[in-house]
C-alpha cells in the first residue's frame, strides 16, 4: 500500500552548488529505486537555521513530497544518516 510522505533535509552550507545537486539526486534515486514516486521537489536554497547546529547557523533546505511503501522511509532515513553534509532531516507521513 502506497502512502504519501514528505521529507525536509538541511545540507551543510560549505557544500558547493554541484555537491548539493548531487545529494538531492542521490536522495531522489533512493526514493525511485525503492519503488516510490516523487510528486514534488522544492529547493528552498540557503537559509538561516532557527538555532545553531554543530557550530553552523545556516544550511541548504530541500523539501521532497513522495509516495512510497511503508518500508522506504526507513531506508531513506538510513541514507540520510550515513551521508556526509546532511545537518538535519525529517520524514513525515502526510495524512491528507
Q: Language-model features: where?
A:
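Structured, basic alpha/beta domains of bacterial-type, RNA-associated proteins
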Residues: 2-96
